[in-house]
Regions:
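Short, exposed beta-strand-loop hairpins at the edges of beta-sheets
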Residues: 191-208
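Boundary of Sec targeting at the N-terminus
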Residues: 23-25, 38
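Solvent-exposed loop/turn segments connecting transmembrane beta-strands
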Residues: 59-64, 188-191, 211
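Solvent-exposed helix/loop surface patches that form functional interfaces
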Residues: 39, 92-186, 205
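Sec/Tat signal peptide C-region and signal peptidase I cleavage site
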Residues: 18-22
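Bacterial N-terminal signal peptides
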Residues: 7-17
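Positively charged n-region of N-terminal signal peptides that target proteins for export
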Residues: 1-5
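N-terminal mature ectodomain segment of secretory-pathway/periplasmic proteins
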Residues: 34-113, 199
Length: 216
């Protein structure tokens, strides 16, 4: 599968009507990624009981943005995820250029990828691990999904990620790091994440990259 962006080495309301309870179950926010105090990316996301959507906007020369939409299963896996990569920004009648679209369907230990790019439509099937979580470089909303998945899995210190930027499956380890934090080792990259009791990521760091993540 053509890389989507970068390789892996980057770095409740009580007694409320049903509609209000549904709204309370929806969580949204923005992750701000900083390197040496400069903003390198912004990720806006919304997570409901059955769907996770977000846009990761990179502060690069091409003004790349990646919009994703994923189905959330009861076990916190994401059996279907769609990603659209665009370059530039919408300006009046001129729209940002769509450079790639991809859809990934997970079933047991395989991932079927439909990709539309410059070469047309391409379909590939990759081997992976059952329950693997999609990994999109710099997406902390997807890392949060992995934390939520781990908390629902017996002995959930081990997590598998399916790299959307290459099709590899990467083993990861989740370990406690103080009362309100965890460390997540994905390959040789370590993430420090501040989390709450529900598994929401409140902020974090990538120490080796000198990247700080704030949630707003």
């Amino acid at each position: 599968m053509k890389p989507l962006l970068f390789p892996i080495t980057v770095i409740l309301v009580l007694a409320a009507p049903a509609v209000l309870r549904a709204q309370a179950a929806t969580d949204s926010g923005t992750f701000v990624l900083l390197h040496a105090r400069d903003t390198v990316a912004l990720e806006q996301f919304s997570r409901g009981p059955t769907k996770l959507v977000g846009t990761l906007a990179l502060r690069n020369a091409k003004r790349t943005s990646e919009r994703y939409s994923a189905v959330i299963a009861p076990d916190a896996t994401l059996p279907l995820v769609e990603v659209t990569v665009r370059e530039g920004v919408d300006s009046g009648p001129r729209k940002a250029k769509v450079v790639q679209r991809a859809r990934v369907i997970f079933k047991q230990d395989s991932a079927a990828v439909d990709e539309v790019g410059d070469a047309g439509l391409m379909t590939r099937v990759f081997g992976t691990e059952t329950g693997a979580v999609p990994y999109l470089n710099l997406s902390f909303a997807l890392l949060e999904q992995a934390v939520r998945r781990a908390r629902l899995t017996p002995g959930g210190s081990k997590i598998s990620f399916f790299n959307l930027g290459g099709g590899q499956t990467i083993a990861a380890t989740l370990s406690p790091l103080g009362a309100d934090s965890v460390k997540l080792d994905i390959g040789d990259i370590r993430f420090h994440l501040r989390v709450d009791s529900a598994g929401r990521v409140l902020g974090g760091r990538i120490p080796v990259q000198d990247v700080v993540v704030q949630r707003k």
